[in-house]
Amino acid sequence: AFNLRNRNFLKLLDFTPREIQYMIDLAIDL
């Protein structure tokens, strides 16, 4: 699971497309 509170959002640049898609899917579910 991703804990965005403990992540610097600038590190989104380091995420893989799969991880980005996963977070987008999570956001849609919320």
Swiss-Prot record:
The catalysed reaction is: carbamoyl phosphate + L-ornithine = L-citrulline + phosphate + H(+)
The record's Gene Ontology cellular component field reads:
cytoplasm
Tell me, which GO biological process terms does this entry list?
arginine catabolic process to ornithine
Q: In which pathway does it act?
A: Amino-acid degradation; L-arginine degradation via ADI pathway; carbamoyl phosphate from L-arginine: step 2/2
Keyword Cell wall biogenesis/degradation part of the UniProt annotation: no
Which domain of life does this protein belong to?
Bacteria
Task: Name the EC number(s).
Answer: 2.1.3.3
Q: What class of enzyme is it?
A: transferase
Q: Which UniProt keywords apply?
A: Arginine metabolism, Cytoplasm, Transferase
Q: Where in the cell is it found?
A: Cytoplasm
Q: Name one GO molecular function term.
A: amino acid binding
Major localisation: cytoplasm
Q: Which family does it belong to?
A: Belongs to the aspartate/ornithine carbamoyltransferase superfamily. OTCase family.
What is the protein name given in its UniProt record?
A: Ornithine carbamoyltransferase, catabolic
Q: Which organism is it from?
A: Aeromonas caviae
Q: Write the lineage as a comma-separated list.
A: Bacteria, Pseudomonadati, Pseudomonadota, Gammaproteobacteria, Aeromonadales
Q: Which gene encodes it?
A: arcB
